[in-house]
Curated annotation (Swiss-Prot):
Pfam families: E6 (PF00518)
Matches recorded under InterPro entries: E6, E6_sf
Gene Ontology terms describing biological process: DNA-templated transcription; regulation of DNA-templated transcription; symbiont-mediated perturbation of host apoptosis; symbiont-mediated perturbation of host ubiquitin-like protein modification; symbiont-mediated suppression of host innate immune response; symbiont-mediated suppression of host type I interferon-mediated signaling pathway
Protein name: Protein E6
Any Gene Ontology CC annotation: host cell nucleus
Keyword Phosphoprotein carried by entry: no
Zinc finger extent (unnamed): 27-63, 100-136
Length: 146
């Protein structure tokens, strides 16, 4: 990566004077072009642009899902509850940058608190703490109530 290559999708658009709607990125794994939905998800998940031979790449949804699962299976270390994470790191959950281990979206403070209140484990995978975002937690059970 060069010293001035942007790693954020919005900085890429700004630096190269390209509208987000006109941006085209190729998946670093399968080399397919990202769809508009995948570009939006890439931006929402705050994923980093990868540079190969001075060319920017993103990641498509199927490849991201596969790579996240591979990372979890190969690099899972241990799991524990929120208070233990805080004791281990010496920092509050609010200060920690925690991503969803299923989709890679950064967790909001509310999602972190939900995990604590619902007694759901955080997972230490590849040297980073991960959890589950609200979209990956599972279906809403409220609609199943009589």
């Amino acid at each position: 990566m060069g010293p001035c290559n942007p790693t954020n999708i919005f900085l890429l658009c700004k630096d190269y004077e390209v509208d987000f709607e006109d941006l085209r990125l190729t998946c670093v794994f399968c080399k397919n072009e990202l769809t508009t939905e995948e570009l939006l998800a890439f931006a929402l998940k705050e994923l980093s642009i990868v540079w190969r031979h001075n060319w920017p790449f993103g990641v498509c949804a199927p490849c991201l899902a596969r790579e996240v699962k591979v990372r979890e299976l190969r690099h899972w270390d241990h799991s524990c509850y929120g208070p233990t994470v805080e004791q281990t790191t010496g920092r509050s959950l609010a200060e920690l940058y925690i991503r969803c281990h299923a989709c890679s979206k950064p967790l909001s403070i509310q999602e972190k608190e939900h995990q604590v209140q619902a007694y759901i484990h955080f997972h230490y995978i590849a040297g980073q703490w991960t959890g589950r975002c609200c979209q990956c937690r599972g279906p809403c059970t409220a609609r199943w109530q009589p």
